[in-house]
Every structure is written in C-alpha cells, then in structure tokens.
Regions:
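Short hydrophobic transmembrane-like helices used for membrane targeting/insertion
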Residues: 1-2, 191
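Hydrophobic alpha-helical transmembrane segments
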Residues: 4-182, 187
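Conserved small/polar residues in nucleotide/adenosyl-binding loops
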Residues: 22, 192-195
Length: 195
C-alpha cells in the first residue's frame, strides 16, 4: 500500500512538473524528441514489413497490424524498463526520467504559440499572414481561406490538437506514467502518418 501511494505521487509529481516544463519551455529544437524517433522507426519498419509480406491487401493488413501492435507495446516496454531501472538506482532518477518524458509527451506551449500567431495576424487584418500561420498547424490548403475560414480552421485544429497533444497524454500519464503516455503518442504518431 505504501509503495502504491509513493508510485502514484511520483507519477502525479512528474506529470505536473512535465506540464509546467512544457508551458515554460515548449519543445526546444536542440532536444531530441521521442515523436521524431517514433516517426523514423515507423518509416523503417514499414519498409521492412512491406518487403517481408506480399503486396496484397491481406499482406498489407498483416504488416499494418504487426506495426500497429509492436510500436506502442515496444514503446511501453522500453520506457517502462528504463523507468524501472531508474527506480532501482534511485527514486529521484525515476522521477527525473518520468518528468522528462511527461514534458515531451505534451504539446501545450506549441499549440498556444501557433494559435496565438494566427490570432495576431487576424487582429492586424493581415489575411495572407493569417493564412500562412494557420497553414503551419493544419493539414489542408489555406491559400483561399477567408478570415472566417482561417478562424474555423484554427479552432478545429486547436480543439483536435488539444485532445491529441494535451488531454489524452495527461490522461495516460495519470493512468500509467510517462511510459503509457508515450505508448499513446506512438499510436497517435502511427495514425497521423497513416492518414
């Protein structure tokens, strides 16, 4: 019972510290990011699996299923193992690792910065710059959007990215710490690359 309480406090503390670090620092460009690594792993694994399975609908389904299962499970196992080893060395090291990964699993500051850039350009009534700003956060052509279209695209993207980049990772952090949050990010990254 005492261990479970300590584990819960470690996870809660790491999630709160990670959230605050994300708000303060965002994603520094110099820091390697797990989602970038996940994207590289997905690219390599897709190529390998496509060579090993026949180029038929059934082969693609089998390869996709294997990748969809192995990426989050591998992420969970690796991150969980690192956290366990860190805990064996010292609880403070485990807390530091969990905090770092919680920070990297979140995207609140980036979302705030990008949406504020759209708002600034709209307030200046600079529609071409507002289109360019919203184009950095949406996956569609923004060249012909009206001001209302820019607002709609920004609101839709902020809502979706808040769920994907803030709310869901926090939920998974509270359920299973940084390893589970990063496993969620692995699933989300795979889905994002598939669409």
């Amino acid at each position: 019972m005492v261990w479970e309480r300590r584990r819960a406090m470690l996870i809660l503390g790491a999630a709160v510290c990670g959230f605050l670090l994300d708000l303060l620092l965002g994603d520094p460009e110099w820091m390697p990011h797990p989602v970038v690594l996940m994207g590289k792993i997905i690219s390599r694994a897709e190529g390998t699996l496509r060579r090993r399975f026949p180029p038929t609908p059934g082969g693609e389904i089998a390869a996709g299923t294997i990748l969809a299962a192995l990426l989050p499970l591998g992420t969970l196992a690796f991150c969980g193992g690192v956290c366990f080893l860190a805990l064996c060395i010292h609880p403070a090291l485990c807390f530091a690792v969990q905090t770092l990964w919680c920070w990297q699993a979140l995207a609140m500051r980036g979302l705030l910065q990008e949406s504020a850039a759209v708002q600034r350009q709209l307030e200046r009534e600079n529609l071409p710059a507002a289109r360019a700003a919203v184009g950095r956060i949406v996956g569609r052509d923004t060249d012909r959007l009206t001001a209302e279209g820019v607002i709609r695209a920004a609101v839709e993207t902020v809502a979706e990215n808040f769920c994907d980049g803030v709310a869901a990772p926090l939920l998974y952090m509270f359920l299973g710490g940084a390893p589970l949050a990063l496993a969620y990010k692995a699933v989300n990254t795979k889905i994002g690359r598939a669409s």
